[in-house]
Amino acid sequence: IITHPPEDYHSDHRSLSHHVKSSAGFKYPLLFCETLMGVNFNPNIYIDISEYFKDKAKAILKHKSQNPVKFLNAVEINNKFRAAQCNAGGQSYAEVFRFEPTFPFVDLRYLLPSTMPIRPYYKNIPSSLI
């Protein structure tokens, strides 16, 4: 189950998070999704959505009540930033989640698509500094 984090900026989202967590009990694992601009959110799961970002953008633009053009711009910036945290190149996008292990779910990687590959970053350092 994917829900808002308990520390979300919006009181309705915090309330929903609490009720979803209570309802899930010990039956279902929870993933917390990121707030719009990642405020106070520390993810531990990164999912490559590059292949699906155009579909996501089309869906956002259909959500007329949320100022979709402005919203889409913020989402695009955030998804690019999260991909950059994995050193992804070019037109890469990532969505992030936080999983907090709770009994009996200590590892749910088997349920998720593979995470974004982390590309190494090399920097030439003058030998005099080594």
What are the residue ranges of the model-derived segments?
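Metal-dependent de-N-acetylase/amidase catalytic core
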Residues: 1-130
